[in-house]
Regions:
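Membrane-embedded alpha-helices and immediately adjacent juxtamembrane helical segments
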Residues: 1-328
Length: 328
């Protein structure tokens, strides 16, 4: 443990953070965050509905929905959480005709997977990789299937999280009668550790699976752990800011929507900074994030060129071209 707090280790960590911050600025990651927040407005309800449906196959749908919205309420406030709940209720396919269910299901899947496509494209730019343009429809199909697998993973993580929380809650109630003070602290720490593990797993899957790149698991692990720490620290501050902004009379009736947009915007900024940190960490190790077999590496260069002649102009009267030199 001491090796992480030596003078050299702290210096290396500072250099990695400096490179990550520089990349975050140069790649205009905040624009990606704003773009993701916009897409999430349309994808959030379908995504949550699919997650609830998948987890509901194993546990009670109402129990899962209740726990999920309790977590969302902690992130964006009661009004915004209620608005998300209403959006999901309108997307329910029960009681509709077969044709409506089929069309609605397709629309639901496309809407839910769009947000992952946006994340993939943004991380590709940050990691300087790009899929080859050939067979674009195959690439699109693959991306949709990949996004679908991530939704299944999210549903599984939600299920595991709820099961563990339920088991811990039952154990907490039993032990509290014997050790009331110590039990509260112990289970508070356990809850933080479990939340950290789930969030780290989610970020690791995103960094490893979504981009069109090859990256070792140990490099993914370092980036995911850093991003999770950043997320856990930022979640509390973001929650306070979003809540105070949403309750402001400045936004009026749109306060709930603004709360959702702000929360996704700042969460996306943390995700993309984590991607920049992962790239900076890999570069520091003397390696490079390689493109996948179906992708290529993209290099950006700034080129200055002296122009000796201006573009040709056409004389309106004679119809002849006029060449002119640049005055020095």
């Amino acid at each position: 443990m001491k090796k992480y707090f030596t003078k050299q280790a702290l210096k290396d960590g500072f250099n990695i953070m400096k490179a990550a911050g520089s990349g975050f600025s140069n790649d205009m990651a905040l624009k990606f965050s704003a773009s993701l927040a916009y897409y999430t407005v349309f994808s959030l309800a379908p995504l949550l509905l699919l997650m609830i449906s998948l987890a509901g196959l194993f546990l009670g749908r109402e129990a899962i929905q209740g726990e999920l919205f309790k977590e969302i309420n902690g992130f964006v406030g009661n009004d915004a959480a209620k608005q998300i709940q209403d959006m999901i209720a309108r997307l329910e396919l029960t009681g509709k005709s077969t044709t409506s269910v089929i069309i609605g299901s397709i629309t639901l899947v496309i809407g839910a997977t769009t947000v992952f496509g946006e994340i993939q494209e943004s991380i590709n730019i940050i990691w300087q990789v790009k899929a080859k343009p050939k067979k674009a429809w195959l690439k699109m199909l693959k991306d949709r299937l990949l996004s679908g697998s991530l939704i299944i993973s999210l549903g599984f993580l939600l299920l595991v999280s709820l099961i563990l929380n339920g088991a811990l809650s039952a154990l907490n109630d039993r032990l509290r009668t014997y050790l009331p003070d110590i039990t509260v602290f112990i289970f508070y720490v356990i809850n933080i550790v479990l939340s950290f593990a789930v969030i780290t797993t989610l970020f690791a899957v995103i960094f490893k699976v979504l981009p069109d790149a090859k990256i070792a698991w140990k490099d993914v692990r370092s980036g995911a752990i850093f991003t999770s720490i950043l997320f856990m620290l930022g979640r509390f501050l973001i929650g306070i800011y979003v809540e105070s902004s949403a309750n402001s009379s400045t936004y009026g009736a749109a306060g709930s929507l603004i709360a959702i947009l702000l929360w996704v915007y700042y969460t996306a900024a943390i995700l993309y900074f984590g991607a920049e940190f992962t790239k900076a960490y890999v570069d520091f190790k003397g390696k490079r994030i390689e493109p996948a077999d179906y992708a290529v590496h993209v290099k950006q260069m700034e080129v200055e060129r002296d122009v000796k002649k201006l573009p040709k102009k056409i004389d309106k009267e004679t119809g002849k071209s006029i060449e002119s030199e640049v005055k020095k």
